[in-house]
Amino acid sequence: MQKPHKPKDWRWLLHRALSIIFSRTVVTVVLVLAQAVWLFSVFYWLSDYSRLISRVGLAVSALMCLALVRKDSTAPEFKISWMILFMLMPVQSGLLYLMWGDKRPAIPLRRRMERAEAELAPLRTGDPAARAELARRDPRLAETADYLQNYAAAPVFGGTAVRYYPVGDVMLPDMLADLQAAQHSIFVESFIIGMGEMWGQIHEILRQKAAAGLDVRVIYDDAGCLSLLPHNYVDLLRADGIRAFSFNRCVPVLNLVLNNRDHRKIMVVDGRIAYTGGVNLADEYINKVTRFGHWKDSGVRLEGPAARSYANVFLTFWRAHFPDETLDYDKLLPQVAPVAPTGGTLVQPFADSPVDREVVAKNVYLEFINQARHSLRICTPYLILDNDLLTCLSLAAKRGVDVRIYTPGVPDKKTIYQLSRSYFPHLLKAGVKIYSYTPGFLHAKTWLIDDRAAAVGTVNLDYRSLYLHFENSTVLYGGEVLSDIRRDLDGIESVSRRLGPDDCRNGFLGNMLSACLRLVAPLC
């Protein structure tokens, strides 16, 4: 006979329910929604009861509409979405655009970022011999490298050993070993930090190293950790001697600047070893917990001069938030001697930012698509394409390039999954091959171009990564590491299902939903 529940079980359930209801995430969402309802109510009330205000609203909308059309730097998809909003809400949309039409971060942060970039970008010095070697191997790829040098202050490096990781499970032991061996400094930047085995091990090492006198710094995104960390977690880290801050704090105020998130994943040890990729610091990324089947990710370890570039990217972000702090760049950005290269791989780490209007990651992706001669293989968890990317991918397939895109078989966000699948019919018709990773969720952001170059980083194929977030990636030119990436992609394909037109039929309601989602996607 089953025993009845004890009273403490009910108290625990009540405590759990109240903890969820009054959690920071729920309170923030509820307050923001309440403000949104109030704001739209005020707009409609004013338009209904005041002819003068209606006329002013129409005038503002007309001016904002003209300003939007005039903006050459704004993607057509953003313009179309706003134009539809102007038609649906002619009185209110002008004020909405005035408040939230600029997708860049707030002006104070932009100015601090610009000053920090101006201070640290000159310290990102590369190896002229590496650029010359790349030009000798592949002049066209060297032009892409020049673009990154000129518009992202991202030089090319030789003398850097590169290791590719097909899953976070394999990457973690090396990360822990390098952290344990740190002698001077440790920098950690992550979109998500979650309490558990992975972060617990890393945090303990950071605490020990900080106590030993090393310079240990941590940056995490507040929205990414909103439901995962206590609201005062920065104070807890500082109590351990770890310098830390959470980026773009989530406050219950209706503000689309919250869209600008720090999506980077960077770990730098002593300025000479760096890790990056799609792996956040939470247990699902090393398959210690199961959320959406097997979690497939990727990452790279850089040892040598290229790692210094990621230390510079981290410190640029840090400098923007602590402009008055004295930073000893000779100590924090030490010169790194070349190490034995892995198969002669040339390395080019770069960062992308919404502060300027240069969509660096998107332009690099377009370069890769247009340069592909024989094959182009892409891993992405989300496939929300603007017209430029959709056209270039289709054209590459039509001119005979073997274009293969690997997507999740088990989605983490069903609405985004539905939106991603809405692009499949067009791509399939053009000859693009699309695969669904049946074991679970594919979170890797890996590109392989003709076995000539690859990219491993944080950049998804969606509007948020390409236009709104702070991102980073590593371009790899040649060498044995490309063979490792190719083997990983072959492994993904062996357990994936190739999709056909019949897999993409949504019916009338599904197609209408996808159309609506496409209209809303650029605004979110």
What are these regions (language model features)?
Residues 186, 373-376, 402:
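Structured, soluble regulatory/oligomerization domains located on the cytosolic or IMS-facing side
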Residues 382-403, 408, 413:
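Helical hairpin unit composed of two closely spaced alpha helices linked by a short loop
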Residues 419, 428-431:
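CN hydrolase (nitrilase-like) catalytic-core segments centered on the catalytic cysteine
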Residues 445:
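Catalytic-core elements of nucleic-acid end-processing and repair enzymes
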Residues 391, 417-421:
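Short glycine/threonine-rich loop-to-helix capping motif typified by GTGT followed
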Residues 1-363, 367, 371, 411, ...:
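N-terminal localization/anchoring segments of enzymes in phospholipid and broader phosphate metabolism
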Residues 434-438:
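Active-site donor-binding acidic/aromatic loop of nucleotide-activated sugar
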